[in-house]
Each structure stands twice: as structure tokens, then as C-alpha cells.
Amino acid sequence: MDSFDPQQLGLSPARFAGTFGSGAASVSCSRLRQVQSVLTQSSKSQPDGILCILGIDSRYNEGCRELANYLLFGLYSQNATDFEKTGFSEEILDDVILLIKSDSVHLYCNPVNYRYLLPYVAHWRNLHFHCMTENEYEDEEAAEEFKISSFVDMVRDCSRIGIPYSSQGHLQIFDMFVVEKWPIVQAFALEGIGGDGFFTMKYELQDVSLSLWNVYSRMDPASLENMLSEDLAVFEHQWTSFFANFDTEIPFLLELSESQAGEPFRSYFGHGMLSSHITENSPHRQPFVLFGNHSTRDNLSAGSFNFPSEGHLVRNTGPAGSFAKHMVAQCVSPKGPLACSRTYFFGATHVPYLGDNEKLPRTTEQIRLLSQIYAAVIEAVLAGIACYAKTCSLAKAKEVAEHTLESGLVFTELVPFKADLRSKVTFHIHAVNNQGRIVPLNNEDSLSFVKTARMTVYDIPDLLGGGGGGCLGSVVFSESFLTSRILVKEKDGTITPETSYIILTAAIPRFCSWLVEDSEIKLSEKTLQATKGDDCCLGTLLTGGKGAYLYSNSPQSGPEEGSAYFFSGGLLFSHRHHGSIVIAKEHVDAFSFYDGDSTSVVAALLIHFRSSILPHLPVHFHGSSNFLMLALFPKSKIYQAFYSEVFSPWQQQDNSGLSLKVIQEDGLSAEQKRLHSNAQKLFSALSPPAQDWSSPKLLSGKLPELDRFLQHFAIGSIGQEPVMRAHLVGLLQQPEMSPAHEVESDKVVISIVTGLPGCHASKLCAFLITLHKEYGRWMVYRQIMDSSECFHAAHFQKYLSSALEAQQNRSARQSAYIRKKTRLLVVLQGYTDVIDVVQALQTHPDPNVRSYFTIGAVTVCVEPLSCYMEHRFLFPKCLDQCSQGVVSNVVFTSHTAEQKHPLLVQLQTLIRASNPTAAFILAENGIVTRNEDIELILSENSFSSPQMLRSRYLLFPGWYEGKFDAGSVFPLMVQICVWFDCPLEKTRFVSRCRAIQSSIKPSPFSGNIYHILGKVKFSDSEKTMEVCHNTLTNSLTIVPVLEGPTPPPNSRSSPQDNGQPECYLVFIGCSLKEDSLKDWLRQSAKQRPQRKALKTRGMLTQQEIKNIHVKRHLDPLPAGYFYNGTQFVNFFGDKTDFHPLMDQFMNDYVEEANREIERYNRELEQQEYRDLFEQKPKP
């Protein structure tokens, strides 16, 4: 399985829609860092880790489930039906334990849910899988013991553990004894496999729910996408229902009550609040619909709208009991941050042009002035939002909003009321978290919250002084918006913010009106009828039809869909709410037409109008640029009819002197390009196949600025680490502005090859250098071996400085040639995080070095047999070495002949989940066989590509300035270099290496030796041999060191110049001790003979006594003894098996043996012997 398909696994694809596309890994890692930040807060009692246990093992604790869903994008929000589709029980899929530490994560799972979890977690930094293989998992008893032992291992290094005890809105009193009753926690106390004691007695537990709730409440790209595709869709549906109420009641609109009109908002909010557990009651976060003069300050500030009025109708809420001229409405998401308010009108704000210049009726004039105030309020709120997004200052935003409002009230009729209106204006910006709770705007996390900007002009008087001079009511407008900020570092080192914002509720119509008076309705109908007559002021009807969209650059208006009728002398646009809009040629300066010379491009008729048309144009179409755009969508009937019936006649100049002028894209102004782009997005969204609300196309069509904002927000939401100015354009994915990256000829390209010990990286590098000298002169950097660190940044930086100095010391002509041809190969075999190598170059103190070298590509070598310590527990940094954004190529150095080998496939799936863009290369033992693979490894610009650069900024915030913390190595792998002089015994050394594998211990792996490498001499040869032993594969290679030019001396890597030993071995393993390694190595050398101890009679063996008897039994007998052939007989007839003088014989034997021992010991003492680790005496 090389890629993840949720449908193949039986999970609902809706959960994955858009989640694991571009940037999903960065959001996942960002969320993990947010959770880990709880562990790094300055507190004396901060926990060492956060424990999250799912399923039955935590008695289905909701707090743990909520944390898992936050980190895994709602994976455990699946319903029972989704889990049944997988074919596995919920208990198996819930079998997950997470321990989150400040720089690492431990994850227990089983082989079944491992593949479900992998796409979500593979890119986490320092991830440790505690998972059995499929075969091991078949033994249920062993599987249960493994889970308990894994749990014990996870928490071994902790003293205080945080528990996400409660879910949001369901705060429970933390009870550690309830935690003690969780099944897996109870199992901790089991003897033998448990942790030797009760969990709650061994560890200090604390509830971290409140801290995590703050984390969950922040907006990030994933929660934004979820809000746009789900919450905003439901939110917009309420407004659709709201408009449907009015459209249905048009014949009886005057009898509509506030209660009827506001029912969709009230039901939506009330039902949602029942399950939201939000107790705050703020008037800014409650829905309302108020007609006419009922929308007073007192009613808007009542704090509760649970009891709407049935008696306030459109008919009776105007001045002096007349019909209302407008209404104010607000819809609020009960469990989310969305809210917006609008002011809509009952009556027309314009009079259709019928060839005369009749004065506006009094009612229309009143509504027109009210709508002008509302238009100024809209511009003020939008200006305030723009100012706040740029400055993050409420005071400045308020100042700008109020100034914009005052500038908008320029009409002579409003002059007497300016001072009075100014005193009745309020402007607020509220920050709202993801649960719909208002939070302080100066909160340090408020940047990541949705905000609502609202302006209200309270209690507007009767502007024309009629009707007894009563109050018309209030005007309200608000929008929910989200800001994004990227800190940009300039060349001079200064930091400047780059901001962006998106108005989330912009798709809700900002302006709407319904015709309620009979005179207005009749006038609209009269206009339509007049166009059909011969004496129409617009001339002859050419064609007409539905499906046209009218655009204006006014902030109040969006695309208005209606019917367009084209005449020889102008056009008429009919809208269901606004009535008829007549645009005669006498009010037009020019007609322009743009269609991009393509049948797939929206055709745009640009109408540049004169100010004389303003009384005949709805207020929200009054734009600062005095133009309208009529969009005709390709393949529509009106589109085809325009070309066949209108295009040619309009191109001919008539009495008005106007003719249709066809323009190209360069003839469009910036504002016209923006509107046309918006129309094109809307056409794309509405084109078949039909899109649902959550589709990116439709979202982009409704919110045209969304794509641009999402690119910005993806970077801005990661953190507050600055971005280099030169990188910003590429990060925001603006390819038309991003120049293709080419490596400058005077730079030295660095090719980095890394991997775990035993991965054959050195062989790959030797192969590259030997066979590919045409790439130029090679410099090779290898890590120093006599260091406890796998990678020493200071040493690497020193090497780079030396390399630059060596190049600069050459002659100018030679330097130019060599500089162009020189490449640096960096070979690192160890538990090194590649990002540390990158940061070492980026943070080099010499700017000349930083500019002289550039990284071409990073390649990691993977030996499948050397990846797992046990089960599926990876060696430290194994997965981190394959990180997206840094590594371009992954070279598999074994099992390449059998490409379907289960181990190879399993690792490829794991690495592909971690790095979807890496190229996979098969190279047995480091030997690459394809030229295209070599090109990938030696690429000069792979590392610097825009995609890689963007991934680095997203996954490694702060990397460019060396501020990204790669985390510690766990389990701690020790690298100990042992120097010696004496040759080793080859046979003993080989046998001892082979025996290491059988002594490997399970977790916590203390004392395990995994790799041995170095240079030694054996007693059977004078040659220096290079040895390399891999414990897991039990492979040992011994090859002569190739003779060649000696590298420059280095005090660290060439100790023989200082009289130190010339042989060394590097031991790599867990918790190794140098003394133990020396003792092990001594057993591989020629053993020093031991002094022999003197013998005594009591030490003689039976065999020795027998030998003495055989040798001396025929010696002369003392008087009174004779030998009968089998026994010795004395004078009294006593018989014995030994010679009567046997005691003397034994004493003689002991004396003789001791003389030999003493001679041997004297000779031994005269021999010169040095311990393996003694230094040679100086000559």
C-alpha cells in the first residue's frame, strides 16, 4: 500500500475531503506543537507528558477522545456505521494510547488501526510506534501483555502526567481514583509485566483540560476549512430561509411580523445553544430581526431576544404608524464564531428611467437617504476591518471607521443631522473563539480567532421631517472576518508584518430591498410593459433572457442575478427584489466588451455611466469608478443571444455616438480584472457537475479572495517565526511572480547523503565519486567519529570555513575554474536529524560561507533490516531523516531484487506517508543503476524548489535562522570511540561480533551494541583493515583500507600525530559504557598469559597420581616388601595397590613441577607485554 485511501479502509471520505492535501502535514504538526506548548509553559507543576487513552481502556473518556480528534482531524468522530464498514470491531480501532512529550510522541496501536493512523501521524517529529507485527498480534495473550509493557515503557521517564479529563463544555471535577479504575491503568500494577505499583501512587496526575481547550479554540487551516465547508454552509442556509420567508410573503409583506421573519435565526440559535453549554448572554452574540422604529438602541441592547414580538409588523413600524422603511437582522452561529448583521429596506432606492427626469417620490427619497447612511456604514466597517488587519489596533480601526463614515455622509439632506448622527454611532470589534465564546481582543491568542466588526447608527430621526418627525430606527452592519499575519525579515534585519484578511460572511447579501407600496410595484411593472412598446425610450428590443449577473465595484453589492434585455438604445436589468434598472445610452459614456477570445471565458459588458444615472440606479450600485459590469456566462442562452442579436448592431455607431468597443485583457483596469476574475470563479463553481456547498470551487466562487487568503493563512498560522522577504512570493504560491530558481555558477553545491548506521551511505558516496567524476572536483565531509554526537555543527561550520579559505587562496583564474567545478559531498551515518545540518549552514557566523555554499539535494539511505529495534519500534530519527521539505530522495539499499518483499513495501508505505513527494530509488548495497536516479541525487536545485521551500517553512518554523528544535534522540544512542594500538586476533574478533546478536535485550535496550565500525590491524597481517559490523543483520565486512593521499591532519580525527593509537573502533548502541566496551575488546586481542600457581599435593589430580604410579611402580622396594605382579605385599601380608614409597614419589613430583612453574613465571616476567589500551612508549 503506497498511498492512503480512506474509502479502501471503509471510512467515510467526507472526513478526509481536502484534509490531506497540500499543507495538511503542516497543520497536523502545528496542532501537535500547540498541544506540546502546554508542557513548556512556565509553571512549577507542568507535566512531563500528556496521556491520551482511547476506547475501553479509559472507559471511553470524552476528554481523551476530544484530544485525539483534534490531533487526528476528527478520525474518532466516525459514527458506528463508518466503523462497521471496516470489518473490525470498535474496540480494535479504539485500541490507541498516546503519550505526548515536549519534543516527542509515543503511540501505541495495533497492526489493524496502524494503517488508519499512519497518514495522520507519520509526519510528527520524533514519533515512536509501539506496535506489534501482524504475526505477533495473532497471539491475544501476548498482544495484551505487549500493550501493558508498552504503556509502562511510555511513562517510564515521567514523574508528572497530564490527563485530558474533560471535553469542552462538560467540565468534570478531576478524580485521580477514577483514572486509577481505567483498565489499562489498573493493569499497570500487575506483577511481572506491570510497573511495580499503583499508577496513581507512582506518578503525579493533573488535569490539563482547560489548557487544551484554549488550544482547541484557535483557528488554523483545518478548522477554517471545516468551518467553511460545514458551519458556514449551515449559516448561509439560515439566511436563505430568511429570504425565502420574505419572497413567499411578498403579496402580504406588510403583514409580516418580526417573529415570523426571525424564526429561522431564532430556531438555529436556540437549538444549537441547547448542546453548546455556553452560558454567556451577550447582545452581540444573539440573533434578532427588528422592523423600522422598533430597532431602537433600547431594543438592540436588551440582551435577550428570546421573546420576539408578534405585534410589530412591517405595516406599523414606520414613522407615525406608517409602514417600516427598513429592518435590521442578525444571525449568530450558536456553537461557532460566525455572526453577521444586515440592514435591508422596504421600498425602492431608485426610480426607473422612462425618458423623463421625474423627481423621486417622498417615500423613495427617505429610503434612499437611509440607504445612503447604510452604504456609508458598510464602507466604514470594511475600512475598520482593513485597518485592524494591518495594525491589530482597535483604537486605530475605530478611528478609521468613524472617519470613513463621516466622509460617506456627504449628501446635503444629511448635513443638519451629521452632528446628531455622529453621537449615535458605535463601532466594536469582538474576538470569538471556535466555540462561539467572546474572548478579550488583547488576548495573546486573539490573532488566531475569528472577529466580528460591527457598526450601529442608533435612533436615526425622520430625515425629511415628515410624519411628525419621529424616529426611523437604527442601522446595523457587521461582518465576521479572520486575519492572517506573516512576519517578514527584510535584508537589513528588520521585521515587518505582512497581513491579509478574509470576510467570512461576505457571501451574505449586504443590500436587499423589497417593493411594498403599490405605487412602486406598479412603476416597476409599467417599466417592463413600456419596454415592449414601440415608443420605448430604449428603442427597439433586440433580445433578452435570464442568467445575467450585474457587478459593481461598490462594497455594498455582490453579483446580482437577473434578466437582461438589450435594446438599440440601451438595456434593462430586471431583479426580483430591486425591480427594473434602466440604463439608457444617454446616461452612458462608453460600452466596452471583453471575452478573452475564448468560449470558456465569461463575457463582460463594461458600462461606463454618467452621474446623471445615479437617481435611476439602486444605491448599492453606485461605485467610485462609475462603471457596471454585466457578466454573461458561456453556453447560456443570454450569452448566445447577445452574440447573435446584439453584438453586431451595437458595434455600429448610432445617433448617440456610442458603439460597442471590443478590448483585450490589457484594456481592463485592475478593478475590472478583479470583478471579471470573480465572475469567472462563480461560473466555474456553477458549471456542471453540480457542486455542493463544501466544494472548493463553490467556496471560491462565493468568496473570491479565499484562495489568496488560504495561502497566506497557511504560513501565518504556523507561528511567529519570520519569513525571509526573498522567499515570501514563492511561499504564497504566486508562480507568475516567482522566478525559476537556478544555482549561480560561482556557488559550491552541497549534496547531502545521510541515513542510520549500516545503511550503506558510505558505499553510495564512494560509488558516486568513483563513477561520476564528470560532475567536477569532489570535496567530501564525514562526521567526526570520536565524538558523542552523531553530528557536530561547530565542526561542520569549521570545515566549511576551511574549504572557503582554501578556495580563496588559489589564483583568480584557477579559482574561478575550480569554484565552478567543485562539489561538496556531506556523508552522515548516524542518528542525525537532517534539519540540524541545514541549520548549521544557515547559521554559519560568516555570511560569505553562507553565500558560497548551497544545498542541491538531500538523499537518505534506508536499509530495511536496520530500521526497527523491535516489533515496529523504529530506531531514533529513522522517520525524521525522511522529512518532507528537506529530503528529496530515499534510497533503499537492500531487498531491491524482490520489490514486493513485505518489509520493503511496509517501509515504503511508512516513508511515503511521511514524505509524499520524495523519489524512491532502489540501489542494492548503495550501487545506483539508473542514470536518472543519479541525476536526482546530484540535483543542484531540488532542495531550493518553491515546493520544498514552502514545506520547510510550514514544517520547520524558524529553520532559516536555526531556531527549530529537532528534539532529542530517544532511546539515547551512545557513540563511543575506542583508540588502541595492538593488533586484534581476527578469529576472536569475528566470533565475538557474531555473538552480539544473541545478546540483544528488549526495551529499554540498555547495553545493546548495534553497530561497530572503524580501522584496525589483525595479527595475521600488516595491513590496516576497515571493519563494519551491523548487529541486526549480523553482517561483518573487513576490507583493506585503500591507500591514497593523506587528508590534512585533524587533532580530533588523527590522534596518531600526537602519539596516540592509530587503530580505533566506534561502538554505537544504547547506554553503553566505555569500560565495558574496552573489556569486550580486550577479549578480541591476544590474551596475556597468566602466572601459574605452585602445586601442592592436595592439588594433584587422580590422573597425575596414576601417572606417577605408572612411572615409579618398578622402583626398588624398601626392606620387607615384595611385588607379586599386581600388588605390593609387606612382611605381615598386607597388600596395597601403590608403591610403599608413593608419598615420596608424589613429593618429588610436586617439587619438580614447581621448579618448572617457577622457571615459567620467571620467563613470563621477563617478557614485555602491553595492555590493548596502553600507549606506545615514545622513542
UniProtKB/Swiss-Prot annotation:
Record's InterPro entries? Answer: C20orf194-like, CobW_C_DAAF9, DAAF9_N
The subunit structure is: Interacts with ARL3.
Its biological purpose is as follows:
May act as an effector for ARL3.
What is this protein's record name?
Answer: Dynein axonemal assembly factor 9
Q: Give the taxonomic lineage as stored in the record.
A: Eukaryota, Metazoa, Chordata, Craniata, Vertebrata
